[in-house]
């Protein structure tokens, strides 16, 4: 509940992973919920993308590897764990880590760290039976073609477009 600038009482509903929000001060405490990864192979010729079923959309979309940060984990530790769980790949180098970003503005309070790096290994299905993920390496041309026909998550669309068009830093 809050009072808007005209003095009218209002209700605002949002989604949060924090079940204990009891004040504005609590809401404004900065925490990082998740990590996403923008990953290439060592030659930087391919980008790793997940093709996954998203229950909230009722369809498969292309996304970036990533997931929730467990209590006590750093974003880098979570990235290594999530990458292995989702794809079977190993994170061999981290080249950039962006500060936390508000990724669900208008809906929730989630903050996500975006990590850039190099991965290697053999793809395998997700170890989580609740996740329907097919991961693979994609060339720039393949990514451009997918952009014409398939749905992407917002982070994946932005960073894969940059990769496909030679605009991704360090690639």
List where the protein language model places each region:
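Short, amphipathic C-terminal "tail helix"
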Residues: 158-171
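Acidic, metal-coordinating catalytic segment for phosphate/diphosphate chemistry
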Residues: 1-38, 43
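Unchanged
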Residues: 33-36, 67-156, 170
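Short loop segments at secondary-structure junctions
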Residues: 5-6, 41-44, 53, 118-123, ...
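Ordered, amphipathic secondary-structure segments that act as subunit-interaction surfaces
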Residues: 39-61
């Amino acid at each position: 509940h809050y009072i808007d600038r005209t003095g009218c009482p209002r209700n605002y509903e949002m989604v949060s992973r924090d079940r204990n929000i009891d004040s504005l001060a609590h809401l404004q405490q900065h925490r990082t919920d998740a990590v996403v990864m923008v990953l290439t192979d060592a030659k930087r010729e391919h980008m790793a993308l997940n093709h996954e079923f998203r229950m909230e959309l009722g369809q498969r979309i292309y996304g970036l590897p990533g997931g929730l940060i467990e209590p006590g984990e750093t974003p880098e530790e979570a990235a290594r764990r999530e990458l292995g769980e989702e794809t079977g790949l190993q994170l061999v180098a981290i080249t950039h880590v962006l500060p936390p970003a508000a990724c669900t503005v208008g809906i929730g309070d989630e903050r996500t760290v975006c990590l850039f790096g190099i991965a290697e290994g053999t793809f395998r299905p997700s170890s989580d039976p609740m996740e329907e993920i097919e991961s693979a390496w994609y060339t720039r041309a393949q990514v451009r073609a997918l952009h014409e026909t398939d749905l992407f998550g917002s982070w994946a669309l932005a960073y894969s477009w940059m990769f496909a068009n030679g605009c991704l830093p360090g690639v």
